[in-house]
Amino acid sequence: MTEIRYVRLLTLVLASSVLLAGCSSAVPTTPVRSATPSAAATPTATPVVPPTVNPAATASLHAAARSGDAEAVRSALAAGAAIEDRGEGGRTPLVEAAKGNHVEAARALIEAGADVNAKDDIQDSAYLYAGAEGYLEILRMTLTTGADVNAKNRFNGTALIPASEHAHTEVVRMLIAAGVDLDHVNTPGWTAMQEAIVLGNGGAGAQDVVRQLLAAGANPDIRDSRGRTSLCNATRLGFGAIASQLRAAGATGC
């Protein structure tokens, strides 16, 4: 009886050992990764595809701008021309159109978003060309679409200075209304008033320019690079009518 109990007990012990060995030899599991990406993951950037530019259409755009063909300008733009492409002399199509006073071609370019402040190799923009040459309609378009009214040309002068020199009276009126700096001094040492006198002819146009500038508050007593005031120069050059205007405004002589 004792022997039988011993055999049963031994059998139970062996069975328990087998079970414990099976538990301890379980295959380790691989950690399961979350299906949700971590917050630090960087999304893949979508490549930026540049817009297609048509070189032939761009060449046609320059030609159309130079000749003033507004319809050809629109066709070239629709065909993929680069509106800010630089051609001869660093001129954009808009600068080319403005330089030739091609109003409708310039309008088509401006309506398409051309930069009215883009300058060519000699530092002239569509706005500056229009002011210097007296192209009133192009000047108006550039002013109403963001032209920098105090942009400077290669002589460090505003559009008002050459406009005054050439007695473009309506341009002068428009620039004054736009808020241009009346007393800016360019590299040669002249304000708009000085240039109207020194490089003008003293005629009716120059007189009107001086009158407008005085009425707008321009300072007639600023001296040029030789130390001469506007009245001094008007007197020296024999422009009696302008000298009288300046005296009436209380200007200082030499």
Swiss-Prot record:
Residues where lipid is bound covalently (N-palmitoyl cysteine): C23
Membrane topology summary: Lipid-anchor
Coiled-coil intervals: none
Pfam families: Ank_2 (PF12796)
Keywords annotated in UniProt: ANK repeat, Cell membrane, Lipoprotein, Membrane, Palmitate, Repeat, Signal
Superkingdom of origin: Bacteria
Signal peptide: 1-22
ANK repeat locations: 56-85, 89-118, 122-151, 155-184, 188-222
S-diacylglycerol cysteine lipid attachment residues: C23
SUPFAM superfamilies, per the entry: Ankyrin repeat
Entry-linked InterPro entries: Ankyrin_rpt, Ankyrin_rpt-contain_sf
Compartments, as annotated in UniProt: Cell membrane
GO cellular component: plasma membrane
Protein name (Swiss-Prot/TrEMBL): Putative ankyrin-containing lipoprotein Lxx09580
Organism field: Leifsonia xyli subsp. xyli (strain CTCB07)
Upper lineage: Bacteria, Bacillati, Actinomycetota, Actinomycetes, Micrococcales
